[in-house]
């Protein structure tokens, strides 16, 4: 029996996307690597973010709309005492300020206050569109437009770690929740300035990163 072409296979690949790559770029590279006819992902991760990006191939692309509505989990690392124009590590530093000593009981109280249904204003540096233009394209030109708040739900925020100038949080949230906005809002309640140093999506509902190959290992993983 001859080898089965991957182009005829259907399924979902949990790709461990690296930082610095757009979700669409990861999708197209995986589609080409696996020689798939149809491919789609289940919701973009920011280029800065790393972690699990479910990729649907061929007949499995019909599942993507259901996965888009699933809850998300993120590990968020935030640098304190620095603010950037984008709210994350990709932006230009606008201001630096001393970081006061962390008060963990007060911090936990603040975190609890940011759970539940909330209205969140999307950041300018996002892929949302305004009159046909991506917001990040306008932001790079120095243009800021009004963004209506959108309802999202933060189910849980846990303090995973902390240091003199950073916080590490595990966030369980609904789709469409912007971690940079959530982080800035939380830290503004305790500290003057902060930015998101990095974000990792460690799992998507049940799956964990242990099941997800990086892009370079996608083909042997899929074939296995």
Curated annotation (Swiss-Prot):
Pfam families: TruB_N. Responsible for synthesis of pseudouridine from uracil-55 in the psi GC loop of transfer RNAs. The gene is truB. The keyword Disulfide bond does not apply. Coiled coil: none annotated. This is tRNA pseudouridine synthase B. Its EC number is 5.4.99.25. Belongs to the pseudouridine synthase TruB family. Type 1 subfamily. Transmembrane segments: none annotated. InterPro entries: PsdUridine_synth_cat_dom_sf, PsdUridine_synth_N, tRNA_psdUridine_synth_TruB. GO terms for molecular function: RNA binding; tRNA pseudouridine(55) synthase activity. It comes from the Bacteria. The active site is at 46 (nucleophile). GO terms for biological process: mRNA pseudouridine synthesis; tRNA pseudouridine synthesis. It catalyses: uridine(55) in tRNA = pseudouridine(55) in tRNA. Keywords: Isomerase, tRNA processing.
